[in-house]
Each structure stands twice: as structure tokens, then as C-alpha cells.
Amino acid sequence: MSCSCGSSCGCGSNCNCGKMYPDLEEKSGATMQVTVIVLGVGSAKVQFEEAAEFGEAAHGCSCGANCKCNPCNC
């Protein structure tokens, strides 16, 4: 079965899966620390985090063997 994921769930350069939010992309073999500075109302930050987590859960893809999406659900 051929698996050709689209722009929001496709392996990009260096076998990094393309995500809707590339800044939230996990790097394999590296530790990433994210610092969030919120200016304004605290509830806006909570809403953004929920939206970002939902976006990641909806795609749920990562680069597998031979630079192919695993699982391919696009």
C-alpha cells in the first residue's frame, strides 16, 4: 500500500515530519526546552496550549523507517 502524506503530515528535509506547527516538532535524539512568555490574560495561553495539543493529536504522525510517516493517517 502506498503512503504519500500531504503537507501537514509529510516527511521533510532530514526526515523530519512536516507538522501544522513546525515549532512544536519533536527532534529525535535531542532534548528540547520550550520557554513560553505570556503577555496578557492567562486564559489565552491555556486556550493556545489546548489548540496546539489538539492539533498534534489530530495528526499523530512521526517519521518511521525509510523516512515514511508512521502511522500514515492522512
Swiss-Prot record:
Domain of life: Eukaryota
Keyword Metal-binding on entry: yes
One Pfam family in the UniProt entry: Metallothio_2
Keyword Metal-binding listed: yes
InterPro entries referenced in this protein's UniProt entry, alphabetically: Metalthion_15p
Keyword annotations from UniProtKB, A to Z: Metal-binding, Metal-thiolate cluster
GO molecular function: metal ion binding
Its job: Possibly relevant to mugineic acid-family (MAS) phytosiderophore production in iron-deficient barley roots. May have a function at the regulatory region of MAS synthetic genes or Fe(3+)-MAS transporter gene by conjugating with Fe(2+) like FUR protein.
Protein family (similarity comment): Belongs to the metallothionein superfamily. Type 15 family.
UniProt name for this protein: Metallothionein-like protein 1
Gene name per UniProt: IDS-1
